[in-house]
């Protein structure tokens, strides 16, 4: 079968957490799914994150962060999947 790409943007409250999660995510790649981490950063989910996700068909995963007001507005119209965990 064909390998599917899963593009991911990871945001967290601190950079070290984001980097650790990105490394764990990359290890989830297998012969069916290739996890591609496009961005890892600290801070709330921004409109720029949503725009990158929309243009690259990525999902955004946030840990101890939330989308800011602009990101919330844009994610709906762009159809971007944003998942937050705390």
Regions found by a protein language model. Name each.
Residues 1-86:
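Conserved structured catalytic cores and adjacent interaction surfaces
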């Amino acid at each position: 079968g064909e390998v599917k790409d899963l593009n991911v943007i990871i945001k967290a409250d601190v950079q070290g957490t984001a980097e650790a999660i990105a490394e764990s995510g990359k290890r989830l790649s297998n012969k069916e799914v290739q996890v591609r981490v496009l961005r890892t950063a600290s801070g709330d989910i921004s409109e720029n994150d949503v725009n990158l996700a929309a243009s690259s068909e990525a999902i955004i995963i946030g840990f101890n962060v939330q989308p800011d007001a602009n990101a919330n507005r844009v994610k709906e119209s762009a159809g971007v999947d944003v998942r937050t965990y705390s």
